[in-house]
Curated annotation (Swiss-Prot):
Protein name: Anoctamin-2
Organism: Homo sapiens (Human)
Stretch forming the signal peptide: none
Main location: membrane
Entry keywords, A to Z: Calcium, Cell membrane, Chloride, Chloride channel, Glycoprotein, Ion channel, Ion transport, Membrane, Transmembrane, Transmembrane helix, Transport
The UniProt record lists the keyword Repressor: no
Reactions performed catalytically: chloride(in) = chloride(out)
Record's subunit section: Homodimer. Component of a presynaptic protein complex recruited to specialized plasma membrane domains of photoreceptors. Interacts with DLG4 by its C-terminal region.
A Pfam family assignment: Anoctamin
Any one annotated GO CC term: nucleoplasm
Membrane side Cytoplasmic: residue ranges: 1-365, 456-538, 604-623, 770-801, 929-1003
Amino acid sequence: MATPGPRDIPLLPGSPRRLSPQAGSRGGQGPKHGQQCLKMPGPRAPGLQGGSNRDPGQPCGGESTRSSSVINNYLDANEPVSLEARLSRMHFHDSQRKVDYVLAYHYRKRGVHLAQGFPGHSLAIVSNGETGKEPHAGGPGDIELGPLDALEEERKEQREEFEHNLMEAGLELEKDLENKSQGSIFVRIHAPWQVLAREAEFLKIKVPTKKEMYEIKAGGSIAKKFSAALQKLSSHLQPRVPEHSNNKMKNLSYPFSREKMYLYNIQEKDTFFDNATRSRIVHEILKRTACSRANNTMGINSLIANNIYEAAYPLHDGEYDSPEDDMNDRKLLYQEWARYGVFYKFQPIDLIRKYFGEKIGLYFAWLGLYTSFLIPSSVIGVIVFLYGCATIEEDIPSREMCDQQNAFTMCPLCDKSCDYWNLSSACGTAQASHLFDNPATVFFSIFMALWATMFLENWKRLQMRLGYFWDLTGIEEEEERAQEHSRPEYETKVREKMLKESNQSAVQKLETNTTECGDEDDEDKLTWKDRFPGYLMNFASILFMIALTFSIVFGVIVYRITTAAALSLNKATRSNVRVTVTATAVIINLVVILILDEIYGAVAKWLTKIEVPKTEQTFEERLILKAFLLKFVNAYSPIFYVAFFKGRFVGRPGSYVYVFDGYRMEECAPGGCLMELCIQLSIIMLGKQLIQNNIFEIGVPKLKKLFRKLKDETEAGETDSAHSKHPEQWDLDYSLEPYTGLTPEYMEMIIQFGFVTLFVASFPLAPVFALLNNVIEVRLDAKKFVTELRRPDAVRTKDIGIWFDILSGIGKFSVISNAFVIAITSDFIPRLVYQYSYSHNGTLHGFVNHTLSFFNVSQLKEGTQPENSQFDQEVQFCRFKDYREPPWAPNPYEFSKQYWFILSARLAFVIIFQNLVMFLSVLVDWMIPDIPTDISDQIKKEKSLLVDFFLKEEHEKLKLMDEPALRSPGGGDRSRSRAASSAPSGQSQLGSMMSSGSQHTNV
């Protein structure tokens, strides 16, 4: 058999072969049976769809390939590369066709010996009918290609079939030559105009029409003046990008149709679809292209999951830090958005959406709105804190506790080692508690509940506004199409089920010699019986993880109790026991939370995988719910303990509650547990944000990038030096971190939203710290997306999905939690009850004495009395904080009437507070419409403009059709008949136009 020519290299290698650069000719025989050539469809007429017109039985080699485009495995290494291609790094080797998508895979060979003189840098080019170049003959040596192992051979064949199917779909491919023992190969994909037009029509992508841009006007004159004034005042805060400067102008868009090309503003076909749209179209083709050799696997995601390919990604628009003057969207985003130096500027949301797609654009729009809403809450929180600082000297309970003339002798804090003590020694704790436990925090809690409602309502309005500007109305069909693509794991499970059932049915047929008809619908999908083991494992695992979290919290409680007891034995450390124990316990909680966060994230992903959800959207929603549940319990369990349980199960002097045979349960400080709750919140919130942002989001990606760089440099030893000095854009993007979704970004902000809203009554400065963190977080995420991640696929979506429901749930739950914090944890209700029910003069004078009960020290249990007491005077009665009957009462140490009165007042406050805030939240929700009035009016206006524009274009089309007919004899009759034949078509198009407009109206 003659060796194939350089233009006819078979892609399915058989046995080891020896390829000579000079061997073969175009007129030689084709490859044997079983070998196959990847071909590109030749040039087609503009009206034809993309695809291959090759006869399936036609051989790959010989004369039959002259007019077809096949992979060229040899390229002259000495041929100078064009300057334009090197500068752009975004095109095929011909410097004409743009790279819309890249597939990457890693290969390895056995026993490969490179002879001298063989070019080190070569390409395998799928051209478009161009003449192939002769192979380089720089040396006499040949290349001995050793056989691949069975797995590599199978993967190679699957890749070749998949790439062939891509070209059958009309795509054009270019790939590297495997000229090393191992390395990475990049398959560049270009979508020609015919493919773009066909897929854009199938996907119903909205594109600009010839209609000029029209202005989106404000609702009224006052709103218009206010908007103009605000725009003028914030001019220096606006990013200098074209998309942001035209944010009040909108194109009239209509779904693309090849039959209505006259409607669109097509100035140049190569630039009509932007890069994000082109890559989105190619990605849709990749998702639905099948590969029969890989068990009929559907789509690129399945091939990546089976390690056939290593990565698939669209290219970035050049480098972001290039010194050249040429500007691209990536460089513009870096200069005006992804740098810490522009933290004060607004985000260029339209440019973000254009570059990354609607899904990522909505995330940054939500993050920007959330950050801006933190500004008023931060201001109010600072005012509340300053109010506490200003009134600390006027707080009567604090003054009474600090007054040394009030000889309140308190009971020992521990057994044996602790002595009696004066309440005035806790003066600092009482004053610090007043900073956060004052009447202003109640009103701040109500404000924050309404703030959460207003934030969600404004987000719905902003979401609708962005959906209108970004042409997201009527996107339901796209979301339904997304549901049609099954996950690779789901397909694998279905195939395993069908194979198992077919084997069982074959055995039954042999045994019974009968034919049974089963339910075919159940065979090609997973039923609840198939999923039941996964559901059971999920339920048991989640319960175990929650129990593990509670066990760790209990372990920290035991640590606090035992450490406090141990430190109390030493006289030198006895005075700082509470501070030491609290600080170390909070740090332990923080470390455990950070560790469990990473573990729970991996566990949630594993649990979701064994459920085998069918679609990516279902997988993402279930993953979010599991991860949020586990991380919510992990982050807030220690805080809930301090807020609602600490000090509630202590007992009383003479009848304390003990754990582990001798350790007393811990109790709150004299000023209450609110101060400790504040410390717990601040350390966990700040530590979580600082450590996760600086270590996990900055440090870990940099280490991964460094590791990949070292690995690439190690493998690049066999690569041509000129190639390594001038890496192409696909090489640069391949070294970046792969994009894994927005779940970690949303999760971090959702947990922070919980810190801001759930316990704001005890920590009014939480919005301030959240604001400072988010100012950095916006730029950190922006820099990560622009500089450190591969470019994500542009995904269209109309909202933020399940995250909105989680936010709404947290907002409602925060009302209940803050009501209980105010009623139970703080002293707000006891002070209120005392002032209006027990005080003689309507003030808080005598409140401290009212909250302290008496205990007869002679009734202390044997062995618990203070040893070597150095108290100045003999103690007969000591005081402890509780509402109990005195020793001389008929029922000593039982709960007093004041206790039950205050308890009923606490519960009444919870009910009143919850219903009041819920009513106000519903009122705010009702007052703020979900759809802005101006957007609702503009939707109607756009519908009218679109119909008028369509009728005008149809009239112009008919006019052009009638002109040549009028010039010819008998043209009048022909023109009338032609107009009559065109009328139904125009009417049907107008009907589709009206139905499209009705979709806008329903929104």
